[in-house]
Amino acid sequence: MSLNFLDFEQPIAELEAKIDSLTAVSRQDEKLDINLDEEVQRLREKSVELTRKIFSDLGAWQIAQLARHPMRPYTLDYVRHIFTDFDELAGDRAYADDKAIVGGIARLDSRPVMIIGHQKGRETKEKIRRNFGMPAPEGYRKALRLMEMADRFNLPLFTFIDTPGAYPGVGAEERGQSEAIAKNLREMSGLRVPVICTVIGEGGSGGALAIGVGDKVNMLQYSTYSVISPEGCASILWKSADKAPIAAEAMGIIASRLKELELIDSIVPEPLGGAHRDVQAIAASLKAQLLDDLSELDGLNTEELLNRRYHRLMNYGYC
């Protein structure tokens, strides 16, 4: 399977191409006198070493590219690897079923829970069907319906954030995009069940916040969380999207910076090369984090949970 190497990974891509070429030759002619296995192993070790070197010093813009990687696991990938008995629930009961938001009831180690997350697509048709992970108001109202259901049936709520932002189309604005987001922010802050949010890719502005008010907020190592995309910021400040790398650094969009600012609680480490390199490994790491978070929150009664969440929200932006 192609790993779809990014621009800054091209030296790794060249090594991997050599490995693939030698492996193919070895399979085609097993009578070769040259021991290709040793050479392939040497190149693989060199590739791992080079990958480790490159990924030890990534900038914010490079991490932003990883957060958008086309092979990066999406919400439904994590649902398959972490949860069982997932039963998807559709529709906002008012207008439509927005495929950019998925959600439903599942089990986490046999415990019933509610799941809500953004969902992007991989192939062209799927990307269009999912609107590139940009929800319309009906998506956020579907999410609200599931939040209220979780509250009613005392189900812990897990949200997975991965969106460039809420859909900015005219129709979405006419149907009340800002109202839908604002209502979710208000209602999530008062849910009487544990709410655990994880940024798994792009955490874009209000579109991310609309399912991001929680008792615990985690970020994967190579995810981003920001009020605007680096390109959008650069276009406003410098009138050119080419300045996106500068904007990414200045905005502090990466997990380590947000942890320093106490805007998130935990950073989930990713496999070498990013989550797409080993989906099972990142899913196992994330599951362990979610279980730890849930175990901690289970020790709080409803009043303690709400008070803690309130103080968390009130401390945002406080110096």
Swiss-Prot record:
A single Pfam family it belongs to is ACCA
Annotated Gene Ontology cellular components are: acetyl-CoA carboxylase complex
Task: Name all CoA carboxyltransferase C-terminal domain ranges.
Answer: 35-296
Has the keyword Lipid biosynthesis been applied to this entry? yes
One example of the protein's molecular function in GO is: ATP binding
Top-level taxon of origin: Bacteria
Keyword check for Transferase: yes
Name the NCBIfam families on file.
accA, AccA_sub, PRK05724.1
Per its database record, what is this protein's job? Component of the acetyl coenzyme A carboxylase (ACC) complex. First, biotin carboxylase catalyzes the carboxylation of biotin on its carrier protein (BCCP) and then the CO(2) group is transferred by the carboxyltransferase to acetyl-CoA to form malonyl-CoA.
Name of the molecule in the record: Acetyl-coenzyme A carboxylase carboxyl transferase subunit alpha
Which source organism? Sodalis glossinidius (strain morsitans)
Gene behind the chain: accA
